[in-house]
């Protein structure tokens, strides 16, 4: 919904270029969205690194494939399954963007476009609920634990600190406490208009 990932660029120069790892995006760009994949691919190229962009929807993967980005590896898989195997690539992750498994902003009365999303998820064998969104994001972070570098940025889309309740809401609401236990700190979080949170370890 927001473009929190754009704010992460300001922290990239704090990554040690001598030991920087790979860039990973869970949830590729899709037709009509904010264009995160080419932007993050450009950042990765600046450090002579590749971007691994992962999406469970083959249509989204095909959309990114047509961009012909020369330093991007496109993986049609769930984020959880990909991240379980990532350490086998012998690379650490220095930048992880979680922008997958959509959030239903009005579950009591979903908008028409959300109903269309839910139908697409069912076609892919998924049940699009907010609980399942949080479960997926937590599973992804748990799977990525061993691969996350000593210096690392994690950007969580559609996730914000709820000041009324004193906890994190949105997609990665369950994942942020886990990241804090891994030594990450919240660099910034905002509700409207960007609805996102950036965490870092070994940053600042």
What are these regions (language model features)?
Residues 1-204:
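A short alpha-helical cap/connector motif
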């Amino acid at each position: 919904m927001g473009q929190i990932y754009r704010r992460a660029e300001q922290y990239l120069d704090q990554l040690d270029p001598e030991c920087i790892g790979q860039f990973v995006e869970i949830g590729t760009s899709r037709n009509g969205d904010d264009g995160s994949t080419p932007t993050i691919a450009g950042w990765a190229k600046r450090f002579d690194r590749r971007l691994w962009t992962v999406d469970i929807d083959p249509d989204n993967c095909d959309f990114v494939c047509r961009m012909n980005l020369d330093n991007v590896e496109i993986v049609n898989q769930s984020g959880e399954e990909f991240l379980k195997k990532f350490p086998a690539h012998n690379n650490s992750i220095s930048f992880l963007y979680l922008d997958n498994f959509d959030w239903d902003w009005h579950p009591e009365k979903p908008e028409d476009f959300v109903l269309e999303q839910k139908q697409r998820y069912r076609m892919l064998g998924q049940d699009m609920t907010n609980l399942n969104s949080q479960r997926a994001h937590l599973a992804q972070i748990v799977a990525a634990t061993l691969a996350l570098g000593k210096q690392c940025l994690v950007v969580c889309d559609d996730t914000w600190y709820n000041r009324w309740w004193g906890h994190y809401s949105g997609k990665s609401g369950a994942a942020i406490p886990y990241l804090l236990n891994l030594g990450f700190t919240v660099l910034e979080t905002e509700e409207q208009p960007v609805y996102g949170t950036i965490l870092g370890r070994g940053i600042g």
